[in-house]
Amino acid sequence: MQKYLSDAMGTYESQAHYFSKPYFERELGNYQQTDYVPDLLTADIRYLAETSRLRQTVIDLAVQAFRNDYSRLPASLAELTSNGYLVKEPVDPFSGKGFTYQPNSDDYELYGSGPDLNSSADSGVEYSPVNGSVSPGVIRLR
């Protein structure tokens, strides 16, 4: 029993250290899942994916308000903060950087990197946890 408790505590301390860092600073291949402690990585990634979608929703609402007031899309997300639509630009919870915003003539693209930290939409792959927690793809609201 003592060995089991010792192993469990070692695993707990290892996971606590792993999750104490922001996602983009973690060594993604270094996560150790064991029978002693539940799989926290999957829960953490789901939380971060929903946080990404929520932050993109805030940006989307600010873009729509800007469009209603100026009859055009903002040239960049920085224009939303300088005009008071956002207090500060939301940050992608996976990469720690800003979301990708690409306006075109009548609409725009908005997305963040997924758990694989690849923020390129060129691949056309949307993140889906069905493909594994740390699977490729961007997280796109629209």
What are these regions (language model features)?
Residues M1-R142:
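Short acidic linear motifs
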